[in-house]
UniProtKB/Swiss-Prot annotation:
This is Digeranylgeranylglyceryl phosphate synthase. GO terms for cellular component: plasma membrane. Pathway: Membrane lipid metabolism; glycerophospholipid metabolism. The chain crosses the membrane at residues 14-34, 90-110, 144-164, 200-220, 221-241. Belongs to the UbiA prenyltransferase family. DGGGP synthase subfamily. The keyword Protein biosynthesis does not apply.
Protein backbone atom coordinates (compact mmCIF):
# COMPACT_ATOMS: atom_id res chain seq x y z
CA UNK A 1 0.00 0.00 0.00
CA UNK A 2 2.74 2.44 0.99
CA UNK A 3 4.78 1.57 -2.11
CA UNK A 4 1.77 2.15 -4.36
CA UNK A 5 1.15 5.49 -2.72
CA UNK A 6 4.81 6.37 -3.16
CA UNK A 7 4.72 5.55 -6.88
CA UNK A 8 1.69 7.79 -7.32
CA UNK A 9 3.49 10.58 -5.47
CA UNK A 10 6.58 10.17 -7.66
CA UNK A 11 4.43 10.71 -10.75
CA UNK A 12 2.86 13.87 -9.26
CA UNK A 13 -0.55 13.21 -10.87
CA UNK A 14 -1.79 16.78 -10.58
CA UNK A 15 1.23 18.12 -12.46
CA UNK A 16 1.11 15.36 -15.05
CA UNK A 17 -2.59 15.84 -15.70
CA UNK A 18 -1.97 19.57 -16.06
CA UNK A 19 0.80 18.90 -18.61
CA UNK A 20 -1.53 16.61 -20.56
CA UNK A 21 -4.21 19.29 -20.48
CA UNK A 22 -1.75 21.81 -21.93
CA UNK A 23 -0.94 19.43 -24.78
CA UNK A 24 -4.66 19.06 -25.44
CA UNK A 25 -5.02 22.85 -25.49
CA UNK A 26 -2.20 23.04 -28.06
CA UNK A 27 -4.06 20.57 -30.28
CA UNK A 28 -7.34 22.38 -29.70
CA UNK A 29 -5.93 25.82 -30.52
CA UNK A 30 -4.47 24.29 -33.69
CA UNK A 31 -7.98 23.19 -34.62
CA UNK A 32 -7.25 19.46 -34.64
CA UNK A 33 -8.44 18.13 -31.27
CA UNK A 34 -11.88 17.22 -32.63
CA UNK A 35 -10.86 16.22 -36.15
CA UNK A 36 -7.93 14.02 -35.07
CA UNK A 37 -8.90 12.53 -31.70
CA UNK A 38 -6.53 9.54 -31.93
CA UNK A 39 -3.47 11.74 -32.51
CA UNK A 40 -4.60 14.14 -29.80
CA UNK A 41 -5.09 11.27 -27.35
CA UNK A 42 -1.67 9.80 -28.14
CA UNK A 43 -0.01 13.19 -27.64
CA UNK A 44 -1.79 13.77 -24.34
CA UNK A 45 -0.91 10.26 -23.13
CA UNK A 46 2.73 10.65 -24.16
CA UNK A 47 2.94 13.96 -22.33
CA UNK A 48 1.40 12.47 -19.20
CA UNK A 49 3.77 9.50 -19.14
CA UNK A 50 6.87 11.56 -19.99
CA UNK A 51 6.07 14.13 -17.32
CA UNK A 52 5.47 11.41 -14.74
CA UNK A 53 8.75 9.76 -15.73
CA UNK A 54 10.58 13.07 -15.50
CA UNK A 55 9.18 13.68 -12.04
CA UNK A 56 10.22 10.21 -10.89
CA UNK A 57 13.77 10.44 -12.21
CA UNK A 58 14.07 13.97 -10.81
CA UNK A 59 13.26 12.59 -7.35
CA UNK A 60 15.79 9.79 -7.92
CA UNK A 61 18.62 12.23 -8.59
CA UNK A 62 17.36 14.71 -5.97
CA UNK A 63 17.01 12.21 -3.15
CA UNK A 64 19.84 13.64 -1.04
CA UNK A 65 18.61 17.22 -1.44
CA UNK A 66 15.08 16.10 -0.59
CA UNK A 67 16.30 14.70 2.73
CA UNK A 68 16.74 18.37 3.67
CA UNK A 69 14.13 20.21 1.58
CA UNK A 70 11.31 17.66 1.58
CA UNK A 71 11.93 14.59 3.76
CA UNK A 72 8.31 13.45 3.38
CA UNK A 73 8.75 12.63 -0.31
CA UNK A 74 8.52 9.00 -1.36
CA UNK A 75 12.24 8.16 -1.56
CA UNK A 76 13.52 9.94 1.60
CA UNK A 77 10.79 8.42 3.76
CA UNK A 78 11.43 4.92 2.36
CA UNK A 79 8.15 4.31 0.51
CA UNK A 80 10.04 3.66 -2.75
CA UNK A 81 13.68 2.65 -3.07
CA UNK A 82 15.98 4.69 -5.32
CA UNK A 83 16.35 1.69 -7.64
CA UNK A 84 12.57 1.24 -7.73
CA UNK A 85 12.07 4.90 -8.63
CA UNK A 86 14.62 4.61 -11.44
CA UNK A 87 12.94 1.49 -12.86
CA UNK A 88 9.54 3.18 -12.60
CA UNK A 89 10.77 6.17 -14.58
CA UNK A 90 12.16 3.90 -17.31
CA UNK A 91 8.79 2.16 -17.70
CA UNK A 92 7.03 5.53 -17.95
CA UNK A 93 9.51 6.85 -20.54
CA UNK A 94 9.14 3.71 -22.66
CA UNK A 95 5.36 4.12 -22.63
CA UNK A 96 5.69 7.78 -23.62
CA UNK A 97 8.03 6.90 -26.50
CA UNK A 98 5.65 4.21 -27.76
CA UNK A 99 2.73 6.63 -27.92
CA UNK A 100 4.81 9.43 -29.45
CA UNK A 101 6.02 7.08 -32.21
CA UNK A 102 2.49 7.02 -33.65
CA UNK A 103 2.52 10.77 -34.32
CA UNK A 104 3.78 12.89 -37.26
CA UNK A 105 7.55 13.22 -37.70
CA UNK A 106 7.83 16.72 -36.21
CA UNK A 107 5.91 15.66 -33.11
CA UNK A 108 8.19 12.62 -32.76
CA UNK A 109 11.25 14.90 -32.97
CA UNK A 110 9.83 17.23 -30.30
CA UNK A 111 9.07 14.24 -28.08
CA UNK A 112 12.60 12.85 -28.52
CA UNK A 113 14.17 16.21 -27.69
CA UNK A 114 11.95 16.61 -24.64
CA UNK A 115 12.69 13.11 -23.38
CA UNK A 116 16.41 13.82 -23.68
CA UNK A 117 15.90 17.05 -21.76
CA UNK A 118 14.00 15.31 -18.98
CA UNK A 119 16.74 12.69 -18.66
CA UNK A 120 19.57 15.24 -18.43
CA UNK A 121 17.87 17.97 -16.37
CA UNK A 122 18.60 16.96 -12.79
CA UNK A 123 21.93 15.27 -13.38
CA UNK A 124 23.56 17.94 -15.54
CA UNK A 125 21.61 21.21 -15.60
CA UNK A 126 19.75 21.73 -12.34
CA UNK A 127 22.80 23.02 -10.51
CA UNK A 128 23.77 25.51 -13.22
CA UNK A 129 22.50 29.08 -12.73
CA UNK A 130 19.51 29.60 -15.01
CA UNK A 131 20.26 26.63 -17.28
CA UNK A 132 17.94 24.20 -15.54
CA UNK A 133 15.26 26.87 -15.32
CA UNK A 134 15.57 27.53 -19.05
CA UNK A 135 15.21 23.84 -19.88
CA UNK A 136 12.09 23.46 -17.72
CA UNK A 137 10.69 26.63 -19.31
CA UNK A 138 11.28 25.18 -22.77
CA UNK A 139 9.64 21.90 -21.77
CA UNK A 140 6.62 23.76 -20.40
CA UNK A 141 6.19 25.83 -23.54
CA UNK A 142 6.84 22.94 -25.89
CA UNK A 143 3.80 21.01 -24.63
CA UNK A 144 1.59 23.37 -26.62
CA UNK A 145 3.71 23.06 -29.77
CA UNK A 146 3.79 19.27 -29.32
CA UNK A 147 0.00 19.15 -29.14
CA UNK A 148 -0.31 21.36 -32.21
CA UNK A 149 2.33 19.33 -34.11
CA UNK A 150 0.48 16.11 -33.28
CA UNK A 151 -2.45 17.32 -35.38
CA UNK A 152 -0.24 18.79 -38.11
CA UNK A 153 -0.25 22.53 -37.24
CA UNK A 154 2.85 23.24 -35.11
CA UNK A 155 2.91 27.02 -35.63
CA UNK A 156 -0.54 27.45 -34.11
CA UNK A 157 0.83 26.96 -30.59
CA UNK A 158 3.73 29.39 -30.96
CA UNK A 159 2.51 32.41 -28.98
CA UNK A 160 1.00 30.21 -26.30
CA UNK A 161 4.31 28.35 -26.03
CA UNK A 162 6.24 31.61 -25.64
CA UNK A 163 3.89 32.86 -22.93
CA UNK A 164 4.14 29.54 -21.10
CA UNK A 165 7.93 29.40 -21.38
CA UNK A 166 8.41 32.92 -20.01
CA UNK A 167 6.08 32.40 -17.06
CA UNK A 168 7.47 28.93 -16.35
CA UNK A 169 11.02 30.31 -16.19
CA UNK A 170 9.79 32.83 -13.62
CA UNK A 171 8.04 30.14 -11.59
CA UNK A 172 11.09 27.87 -11.61
CA UNK A 173 13.30 30.68 -10.29
CA UNK A 174 10.78 31.34 -7.49
CA UNK A 175 10.82 27.62 -6.65
CA UNK A 176 14.62 27.78 -6.43
CA UNK A 177 14.29 30.65 -3.96
CA UNK A 178 11.93 28.47 -1.95
CA UNK A 179 14.53 25.65 -1.97
CA UNK A 180 17.51 27.92 -1.34
CA UNK A 181 18.67 26.36 1.96
CA UNK A 182 18.65 22.78 0.71
CA UNK A 183 20.20 23.63 -2.66
CA UNK A 184 23.01 25.56 -0.98
CA UNK A 185 23.69 22.69 1.42
CA UNK A 186 23.81 20.27 -1.52
CA UNK A 187 26.30 22.46 -3.37
CA UNK A 188 23.94 23.32 -6.24
CA UNK A 189 24.65 26.60 -8.02
CA UNK A 190 21.10 27.68 -8.74
CA UNK A 191 20.36 31.28 -9.66
CA UNK A 192 19.35 32.34 -6.10
CA UNK A 193 22.48 30.69 -4.67
CA UNK A 194 24.73 32.59 -7.10
CA UNK A 195 23.10 36.04 -7.24
CA UNK A 196 21.01 36.10 -4.06
CA UNK A 197 17.29 35.62 -3.63
CA UNK A 198 16.32 39.27 -4.13
CA UNK A 199 18.05 39.53 -7.50
CA UNK A 200 16.70 36.14 -8.53
CA UNK A 201 13.16 37.30 -7.73
CA UNK A 202 13.79 40.44 -9.77
CA UNK A 203 14.78 38.24 -12.72
CA UNK A 204 11.59 36.21 -12.32
CA UNK A 205 9.55 39.42 -12.27
CA UNK A 206 11.12 40.51 -15.58
CA UNK A 207 10.04 37.23 -17.17
CA UNK A 208 6.50 37.63 -15.82
CA UNK A 209 6.37 41.08 -17.40
CA UNK A 210 7.57 39.51 -20.65
CA UNK A 211 4.77 36.95 -20.49
CA UNK A 212 2.25 39.71 -19.81
CA UNK A 213 3.56 41.68 -22.79
CA UNK A 214 3.23 38.62 -25.06
CA UNK A 215 -0.34 37.84 -24.01
CA UNK A 216 -2.17 40.34 -26.30
CA UNK A 217 -0.24 39.30 -29.43
CA UNK A 218 -2.93 36.89 -30.75
CA UNK A 219 -5.45 39.73 -30.56
CA UNK A 220 -3.11 42.32 -32.07
CA UNK A 221 -2.27 40.17 -35.10
CA UNK A 222 -5.89 39.20 -35.65
CA UNK A 223 -5.71 35.51 -34.72
CA UNK A 224 -8.30 35.90 -31.95
CA UNK A 225 -10.95 38.53 -31.27
CA UNK A 226 -11.59 40.74 -28.26
CA UNK A 227 -13.19 37.90 -26.28
CA UNK A 228 -9.72 36.38 -26.03
CA UNK A 229 -8.35 39.67 -24.73
CA UNK A 230 -11.05 39.80 -22.06
CA UNK A 231 -10.40 36.18 -21.08
CA UNK A 232 -6.61 36.49 -20.83
CA UNK A 233 -6.61 39.58 -18.59
CA UNK A 234 -7.42 37.73 -15.32
CA UNK A 235 -4.55 35.31 -15.91
CA UNK A 236 -2.13 38.16 -16.56
CA UNK A 237 -3.25 40.01 -13.44
CA UNK A 238 -2.83 36.87 -11.31
CA UNK A 239 0.69 36.31 -12.69
CA UNK A 240 1.74 39.89 -11.92
CA UNK A 241 0.31 39.64 -8.40
CA UNK A 242 2.13 36.33 -7.97
CA UNK A 243 5.46 37.92 -8.90
CA UNK A 244 4.93 40.57 -6.24
CA UNK A 245 3.78 38.01 -3.67
CA UNK A 246 6.90 35.92 -4.17
CA UNK A 247 9.00 38.62 -2.47
CA UNK A 248 7.27 37.94 0.86
CA UNK A 249 6.18 34.31 0.39
CA UNK A 250 7.90 32.42 -2.45
CA UNK A 251 5.83 29.25 -1.90
CA UNK A 252 2.54 31.13 -2.18
CA UNK A 253 3.88 33.18 -5.09
CA UNK A 254 4.81 30.18 -7.22
CA UNK A 255 1.47 28.48 -6.53
CA UNK A 256 -0.39 31.63 -7.50
CA UNK A 257 1.73 31.99 -10.64
CA UNK A 258 0.76 28.46 -11.67
CA UNK A 259 -2.93 29.39 -11.36
CA UNK A 260 -2.32 32.45 -13.51
CA UNK A 261 -0.65 30.28 -16.16
CA UNK A 262 -3.66 27.97 -16.28
CA UNK A 263 -6.05 30.93 -16.57
CA UNK A 264 -4.00 32.35 -19.44
CA UNK A 265 -3.98 28.97 -21.20
CA UNK A 266 -7.76 28.75 -20.81
CA UNK A 267 -8.05 32.10 -22.58
CA UNK A 268 -6.61 30.51 -25.72
CA UNK A 269 -9.38 27.92 -25.59
CA UNK A 270 -11.91 30.75 -25.34
CA UNK A 271 -10.22 32.48 -28.26
CA UNK A 272 -10.47 29.37 -30.42
CA UNK A 273 -14.10 28.69 -29.43
CA UNK A 274 -15.35 32.16 -30.36
CA UNK A 275 -13.22 32.60 -33.49
CA UNK A 276 -15.12 31.75 -36.70
Amino acid sequence: METGRGLVELARPVNTLAAGALTFIGAFVAGGAVGRPAATGAAVGATWLATAGGNAINDYFDREVDRINDPDRAIPRGAVSPRGALAYSVVLFVGAAALAATLPVLAVCIAALNLAGLLTYTQYLKGRPGAGNALVAYLGGSTFVFGAAAVGSPLAGGVLAALAALSTFAREVIKDVEDLAGDRAAGLRTLPVVVGHQRALAVSAVFVVGAAAASPVPYLVGVFGWWYLVAVCPGVVVMVVAAARSYTDPAAGQRLLKRGQLLAAAAFVVGRLVTP
